[in-house]
């Protein structure tokens, strides 16, 4: 199955975690970086374009600053990232030079991709770099990003970059073999799961929520990233980054790590951007009838089915649409502001102009701007 699925891969996003890139003491593992660059250069020689999403800046900076703190404050992390990012890029460039590869640094915040124009500009830049034969190395701009504009972790960032770059495969390299049925560190009966056809609640339970003091992501964030990529129609492989030949083996379809299959109901580019790149500014609460119409019939959200609104937001912002029990069922771009929705909630569309004195349309969220999240 793997070879058949991956034989058409021509562009891959590779995410490398901090534990893969650092030695036990916390500094950069230059041998590991050199090996990974050798393998990425090998893909380039096969005509496969590579985009690298790399962690490790904070860890490199902390080591350079000789910080003994296991837990850093946000300002300390930002300072460590500022010191570590050029060290990380220098390591990649030195390792790529012997292959004639030029590396290109791209630092992003969630705010960059939430703005549609900047999202498209970032895509254009990526295309230009790949056309020129460069290796884009992407990281979150930790030195300036605060909670409101952070991706959260590079696993999430790698899934968004997969959509941004319209890649054919997401390869996440971590410090364990793949997804296990239980935590292999504490359960001797834990078994490696080689194939995940669909990311169910049971799969999410297996992923747990563990992380480390080196990176910010645990297995749960990797499964979430695989889910986001799957809805874009892209498979994800979770594989052991310290294993020599891992990139070559994974991309060529060998049995390594865990393969997450793409979803059968993949989203188009714009809807994927709405669902996973935009940060919801509020909630719109709906009744059971509206929920059924959205989920079963794929309709737009009308004011008559709205029971309430939470948060303050302007027209055009992304909102969560939640059912009677509070569960998120969809996300979409609101055609009315929160204050306007409060006034028209529960009323028929024909009454909007009478209530507001104007109307933008019959829908609060049009179906073209609405994405069901029931599979997410």
Curated annotation (Swiss-Prot):
Enzyme Commission number: 2.7.2.11
Any one GO BP annotation for this protein: L-proline biosynthetic process
InterPro entries from the UniProt entry: AceGlu_kinase-like_sf, Asp/Glu/Uridylate_kinase, G5K_ProB, Glu/AcGlu_kinase, Glu_5kinase, Glu_5kinase/COase_Synthase, Glutamate_5-kinase_CS, PUA
Keyword vocabulary terms for this entry: Amino-acid biosynthesis, ATP-binding, Cytoplasm, Kinase, Nucleotide-binding, Proline biosynthesis, Transferase
A cellular-component GO term for this protein: cytosol
Protein name, UniProt field: Glutamate 5-kinase
Similarity field: Belongs to the glutamate 5-kinase family.
Residues annotated as domain PUA: 281-359
Catalytic activity: L-glutamate + ATP = L-glutamyl 5-phosphate + ADP
Organism whose genome encodes this protein: Trichlorobacter lovleyi (strain ATCC BAA-1151 / DSM 17278 / SZ)
């Amino acid at each position: 199955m793997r070879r058949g699925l991956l034989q058409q891969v021509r562009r891959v996003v590779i995410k490398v975690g901090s534990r893969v890139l650092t030695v036990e003491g916390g500094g950069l593992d230059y041998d590991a970086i050199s090996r990974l660059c050798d393998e990425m250069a090998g893909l380039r020689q096969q005509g496969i374009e590579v985009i690298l999403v790399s962690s490790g800046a904070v860890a490199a900076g902390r080591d350079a600053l000789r910080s003994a703190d296991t837990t850093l404050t946000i300002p300390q992390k930002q300072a460590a990232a500022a010191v570590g990012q050029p060290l990380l890029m220098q390591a990649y460039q030195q390792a790529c030079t012997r292959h004639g590869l030029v590396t290109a640094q791209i630092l992003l915040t969630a705010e960059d991709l939430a703005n549609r124009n900047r999202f498209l500009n970032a895509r254009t830049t990526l295309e230009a770099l790949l056309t020129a034969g460069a290796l884009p190395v992407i990281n979150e701009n930790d030195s300036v990003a605060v909670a409101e504009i952070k991706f959260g972790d590079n696993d999430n960032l790698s899934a968004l970059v997969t959509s941004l770059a319209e890649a054919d495969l997401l390869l996440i390299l971590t410090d364990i073999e793949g997804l296990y049925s239980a935590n292999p560190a504490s359960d001797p009966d834990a078994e490696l799961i080689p194939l995940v056809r669909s990311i169910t609640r049971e799969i999410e339970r297996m992923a747990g929520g563990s992380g480390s003091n080196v990176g910010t992501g645990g297995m749960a964030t990797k499964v979430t990233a695989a889910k986001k990529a799957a809805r874009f129609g892209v498979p994800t492989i979770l594989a052991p980054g310290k294993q020599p030949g891992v990139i070559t083996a994974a991309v060529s379809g060998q049995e390594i790590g865990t393969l997450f299959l793409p979803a059968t109901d993949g989203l188009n580019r714009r809807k994927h951007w709405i669902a996973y790149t935009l940060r919801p500014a509020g909630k719109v609460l709906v009744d059971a009838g509206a929920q059924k119409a959205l989920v079963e019939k794929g309709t737009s959200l009308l004011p008559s089915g709205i029971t309430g609104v939470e948060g303050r937001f302007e027209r055009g912002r992304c909102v969560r649409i939640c059912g009677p029990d509070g569960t998120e069922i969809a996300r979409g771009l609101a055609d009315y502001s929160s204050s306007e929705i409060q006034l028209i909630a529960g009323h028929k569309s024909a009454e909007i102009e009478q209530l507001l004195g104007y109307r933008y349309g019959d829908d609060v969220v049009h179906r073209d701007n609405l994405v069901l999240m029931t599979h997410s």
